[in-house]
């Protein structure tokens, strides 16, 4: 019974995916920006690897900014320090 349910699900998923390919066309993935090395004593901003906002940065980047520059992201509050 599980096999039948699984096969029906996979078949319906394949049909949906085929429809999306023809509707939306192929889109390439958006490349990530290159890593920018920090400038010692430089301003806090995108040039030293720590963006001005906490949005859209990875966990490892946020942790790095917190340990190196004391700019720590907090949920709902943004940077502190």
UniProtKB/Swiss-Prot annotation:
GO terms for biological process: defense response to bacterium; defense response to fungus; killing of cells of another organism. Keywords: Amidation, Antibiotic, Antimicrobial, Chitin-binding, Disulfide bond, Fungicide, Pyrrolidone carboxylic acid, Signal. Coiled coil: none annotated. Residues 1-19 form the signal peptide. It comes from the Eukaryota. The modification Pyrrolidone carboxylic acid is found at residue 20. Transmembrane segments: none annotated. The modification Serine amide is found at residue 80. Disulfide bonds join 50-65, 54-72, 66-73. One of its GO terms (cellular component) is cytoplasm. It is found in: Cytoplasmic granule. InterPro entries: Penaeidin (IPR009226). The keyword Nucleotide-binding does not apply. Antibacterial activity against M.luteus and E.coli bacteria. Antifungal activity against N.crassa and F.oxysporum. Presents chitin-binding activity. Belongs to the penaeidin family. This is Penaeidin-3c. It comes from Penaeus vannamei.
């Amino acid at each position: 019974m599980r096999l039948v349910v699984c096969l029906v699900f996979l078949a319906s998923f394949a049909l949906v995916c085929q429809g999306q390919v023809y509707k939306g066309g192929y889109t390439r993935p958006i490349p990530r920006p290159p890593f920018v090395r920090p400038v010692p004593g430089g301003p806090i901003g995108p040039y030293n690897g720590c963006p001005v906002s906490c949005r859209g940065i990875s966990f490892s980047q946020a942790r790095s900014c917190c340990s190196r520059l004391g700019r720590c992201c907090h949920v709902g509050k943004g940077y502190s320090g």
